[in-house]
Design a protein with these regions (language model features):
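General marker for long, soluble alpha-helical cores
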Residues: 1-136
């Protein structure tokens, strides 16, 4: 891990009062490093403050490094905050990460939050199918 990543970790811990180093033992190393490299400190702080650590850990276990680096940070925060991680995992099993990245990039913030709050797996599958595979 490089010095810049360590400094970001320390800054997030200072700003949130929570230890994020505990995440390392529970989350694939590449996911954590990618998150700290790709996501600005202010957004990391917001994630740690707005998403329970257990849910954040679960989300970082499921979401891939490519998704972390390619999904817009605001949408990634929506997924972590409003998503049922069991359904997120099921979507990961059904679709390629590329399909998920494309679909999420096409869905508006509001629609993404609505889909996640509704928490209906079939509706989410339909949304990914419509957005990832059609030229719209």
């Amino acid at each position: 891990m490089d010095l810049e990543t360590l400094n970001k970790i320390q800054e997030v811990e200072k700003d949130t009062g929570q230890s994020v180093l505990s995440i390392y033992s529970k989350v694939p190393f590449g996911n954590v490093v990618t998150a700290f490299r790709e996501i600005p400190v202010s957004d990391l702080v917001d994630m740690v403050k707005s998403v329970p650590i257990t849910k954040l850990v679960e989300g970082l276990q499921i979401i891939t490094p490519n998704e972390i680096s390619q999904i817009e940070v605001k949408k990634l925060k929506i997924v972590l905050k409003y998503g049922d991680m069991n359904n997120v995992a099921k979507l990961q099993e059904k679709f390629s990460e590329r399909s998920i990245i494309i679909a999420i990039s096409k869905i508006s913030y509001r629609r993404l939050q609505e889909l996640l709050e509704r928490n209906n797996l079939d509706v989410m599958i339909d949304a990914i199918n419509r957005n990832a595979f059609l030229n719209n």
